[in-house]
């Protein structure tokens, strides 16, 4: 370990630097020293060359003084002699412990006790400026930092080279996988991860190596596109409770403004509704979109308002109401049904269009019901089929009005621009 005042100049000129080699030369040559130190000959030759042109006492000093040292400050002047005294008193203490003791002792000194060392440090500074007027301090580089940089620079090269030969034709693929990209290069399989578990936390920035490919997963968006079709795992929303509706007066739904309702359907292939110039069945029988499963099926205010239900503002909500008209009759439904329960009917807004009820008179039931198995196909991702949810196909308008209302409710939420 180097001395703490190695970077500072010293006035101790009495002990020459070559005193120890002279004593060792008087004792005779050591054969084991030559075999253990291959650089011994080089050092001896350098000392011989230096001593040939200068006296032995100043040769080592001249070589060591090739790099100009900084002048010592007051603490270094005081600690130079104090460190020797502490080292003699405590030979077992480490140099770091000695430095801690010296620091505490220096802080404990008074200004009067520090004054002679401060004056000596100022004299050394002035002398240093006279001896080296163009001196500029250049700090030495730390060897430990260099060593770490070399290790970090050769980290990927050391890992890629042994694996490139073992992978065969895909050896060049490893370098692309080691860049930490979120997706692999198209057209190639993802290579093995380059990060080994025993590397430790020193290379934490390389944890992206061998990350799983993300191009097989869609981006999480709250609103799905109408062009995506029916999802494989649709979301379900519970039907509105009767307690959420007002008990008397005008039956309107308060959170209607929270939804983006657009009565005008977009122009394009997702136009769900009857065409005035053509047959009415192809538009009605189109399967509901994925957006309808999110908003229009389970208690959406604007979607359920367009299903042909008429509000009765003068009648309060009663537990046992008279039987509704045929277009309002629906079988008992579960919480995930496309059609709402009868007790939620007074909450509907009667200002919406009653176009599905007008279409019922023009529809042939026998022709319409043959398409019911297609609408309730299980692979379309719908929650229930007709026989599961209790839909009675022989009912007057139960299943027909349910499907027509489901298809028409998708129109109110398909407010996407054309893609």
UniProtKB/Swiss-Prot annotation:
PROSITE patterns: HMG_BOX_2 (PS50118), SOX_C (PS51516). A motif (9aaTAD) lies at residues 366-374. CDD domains: HMG-box_SoxF_SOX17. Disruption phenotype: Embryonic lethal due to defects in the development of the definite gut endoderm, aberrant heart looping and severe defects in vascular development and remodeling, including a lack of artery formation. Embryos die at about 10.5 dpc. Besides, mutant embryos display a severe defect in fetal hematopoiesis. It comes from the Eukaryota. Detected in lung and testis. Detected in endothelial cells around small and large arteries in newborns and adults, but is barely detectable in veins (at protein level). SMART domains: HMG. This is Transcription factor SOX-17. It comes from Mus musculus (Mouse).
